């Protein structure tokens, strides 16, 4: 009598979890039980519980995943519709004519691309042997660091070519609210009021530590500081620090203010991982290729305004 082993184990099953992490530790044969998590290039989706841990840690580490709007669309359309804010309501006299309004004009179409963010890392075989019980948490934490830093750089400075379109992109990025030759009290105020009230309502500031240090010393004519040191706000709006924002140099855009929820991150594929045993065999290491597919765009450029430095 032959025994048939079912290799089609769902990613949310405990068996898949065990086989997946044994596979990553370099043990032979376990990939045969991961068929339902395998993609077209031979990488495997992490178990459901591990994916949840990764996503939660990535959100906690990633500034933009906290401020932006994130969608997961692995098999979705190649474009998204974004609503344009149009005031269409009007007062009508009793018995008066109500003007028809074509709501299709409310939407703009943005094409999505599958930009690949990838990392290759390697671990000594001795590390795998001696640290079996912390292996999952170590790999998860390291991937979170790698991906969160690369994502933030792309979400700020991405050009849209082989990477997302960042908020500072020349095409598709935030609108310029103020041009200035220096960061002054008045110029920061001008940037704030260059945004429409609807975007100021939930607006936040984003800048580097260097720029924040310069602003912390700004005061008005009466000596009142612009920066509220008690809660790290400017004009009542929270300040977020990103070291991927540029410094105060000619041509740079060191300060952004607005509603970052209009920056959309669309995940086309979650993180998948495959081992690279042969590549690092001679050094007694196991290599890993991990990657994700995503795109991101500022669907309403006027929602975020930036200060651009001039000579």
What is the meaning of each model-derived region?
Residues 80-81, 121, 239, 288:
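Bulky hydrophobic/aromatic "packing anchor" residues in well-ordered structure
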Residues 80-81, 141, 201:
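Hydrophobic alpha-helical segments involved in membrane association or supramolecular assembly
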Residues 83-84, 123-125, 209, 290:
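Residues immediately flanking
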Residues 85-89, 118, 127, 149, ...:
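Short loop/turn segments at secondary-structure transitions that flank enzyme active sites
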Residues 1-109:
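Assembly-associated, polar helix/coil segments characteristic of icosahedral protein shells
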Residues 53, 72-73, 159-295, 300-311:
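Extended oligomerization regions of viral-like shell subunits
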Residues 99-194, 305-311:
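Alpha-helical scaffold segments that mediate packing/assembly in large oligomeric complexes
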Residues 82, 88-93, 130-132, 214-217, ...:
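Short helix/loop capping segments that flank catalytic or ligand/cofactor-binding pockets
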């Amino acid at each position: 009598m032959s025994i048939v082993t079912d290799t089609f184990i769902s990613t949310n099953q405990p068996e898949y979890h065990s086989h997946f992490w044994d596979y990553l530790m370099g043990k032979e044969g376990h990939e045969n039980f991961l068929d339902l998590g395998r993609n077209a290039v031979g990488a495997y989706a992490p178990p459901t519980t591990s994916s949840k841990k990764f996503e939660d840690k990535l959100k906690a580490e990633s500034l933009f995943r906290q401020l932006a709007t994130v969608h997961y669309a692995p098999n979705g359309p190649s474009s998204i519709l974004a609503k344009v804010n149009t005031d269409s309501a009007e007062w009508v006299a009793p018995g008066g004519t109500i003007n028809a309004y074509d709501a299709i004009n409310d939407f703009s179409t943005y094409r999505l691309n599958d930009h690949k963010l990838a990392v290759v890392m390697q671990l000594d075989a001795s590390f795998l042997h001696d640290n079996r019980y912390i292996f999952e948490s170590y790999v998860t934490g390291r991937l979170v660091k790698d991906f969160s830093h690369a994502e933030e750089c792309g979400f700020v400075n991405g050009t849209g070519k082989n990477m997302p379109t960042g908020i500072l992109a020349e095409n598709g990025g935030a609108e310029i609210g103020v041009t200035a030759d220096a960061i002054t009290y008045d110029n920061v105020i001008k940037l704030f009021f260059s945004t429409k009230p609807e975007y100021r309502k939930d607006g936040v500031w984003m800048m580097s530590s260097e720029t924040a240090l310069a602003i912390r010393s700004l005061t008005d004519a009466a000596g009142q500081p612009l920066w509220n040191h008690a809660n790290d706000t400017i004009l009542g709006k929270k300040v977020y620090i990103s070291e991927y924002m540029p410094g105060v140099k000619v041509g740079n855009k060191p300060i952004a203010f607005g509603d970052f929820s209009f920056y959309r991150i669309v995940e086309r594929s979650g993180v998948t991982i495959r081992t690279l045993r042969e590549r690092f065999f001679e050094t007694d290491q196991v290599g890993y290729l991990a990657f994700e597919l995503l795109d991101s765009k500022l669907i309403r450029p006027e929602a975020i305004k930036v200060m651009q430095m001039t000579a």
